[in-house]
Amino acid sequence: MNILVTNDDGIMAPGINILAQKLAEKHSVLVVAPDVERSATGHAITIRTPLWAKEVKVGEKTVGYAINGTPADCVKLGILAIADFEIELVVSGINKGPNLGTDILYSGTVSGALEGAVMEKPSIAISAADWNNPKYETAAEFLLEFLDTYDVTKMPEFTALNINVPSVDRAELKGWKVTRQSRRRYRDYFEKRKDPYGNNYYWMFGEIIEDDPGEDSDYAAVRRNYVSITPIYAFMTNQNYMPKLKEELEGGN
């Protein structure tokens, strides 16, 4: 397959380099990724300044382009302007740390995959689910095997797979689980500090809230050393609430 690879940790990050080299064993890989880290940029795109593309070498077999933009920018630019062949799959990652629960709302990694989905390409976001000890090799090996097993062309439109791989050796993975997005989120707070000139600034911290009791969630799967595979959708309408809201606001109309 012709695969476009991006990330939000930056084109020099180990995760994307390990991923690109592993995928290049069986596929044609084009890397288009931010020139610096763009973590937690969400689905931002650049519309007021130009985008620059600098060719770089990623591993031994892969051509890459460093972009002064976001992951979503990279996917747009890669598909529409840089690639001289048809992109068949977008892969975003390997992210350093998990993208579970509400992480996906902020994640540049997940947004890169969702941008691919919006552009009607099968898309995957993949994360090594440990900030302190990410097992990029495990995640890369898993994805290469997964692509041999799963036909990405069967994915419905505007859908991406959010994959979180536990931070263990490949032999220790118990398998995979198709999961739902958990309610894992954060209780945020800000610490007020002063710079050397006496000016106030704020540094954000967050405590993880894991109050989702279900065993079918992304977090529950990763906790038990299963790879979590969650189908996510580009459109965010709450279909379950629509009938009730319609009745309350429109009545019989």
Curated annotation (Swiss-Prot):
Binds 1 divalent metal cation per subunit. InterPro entries: SurE, SurE-like_Pase/nucleotidase, SurE-like_sf. Keywords: Cytoplasm, Hydrolase, Metal-binding, Nucleotide-binding. Its main location: cytoplasm. Its EC number is 3.1.3.5. It is an enzyme of class 3 (hydrolase). A divalent metal cation binds at residues 8-9, 39, 95. SUPFAM superfamilies: SurE-like (SSF64167). Its cofactor is a divalent metal cation. It catalyses: a ribonucleoside 5'-phosphate + H2O = a ribonucleoside + phosphate. GO terms for molecular function: 3'-nucleotidase activity; 5'-nucleotidase activity; exopolyphosphatase activity; metal ion binding; nucleotide binding. It is found in: Cytoplasm. GO terms for cellular component: cytoplasm. PANTHER family: 5'-NUCLEOTIDASE SURE, 5'_3'-NUCLEOTIDASE SURE. Nucleotidase that shows phosphatase activity on nucleoside 5'-monophosphates. Belongs to the SurE nucleotidase family. This is 5'-nucleotidase SurE. It comes from Kosmotoga olearia (strain ATCC BAA-1733 / DSM 21960 / TBF 19.5.1). The gene is surE.
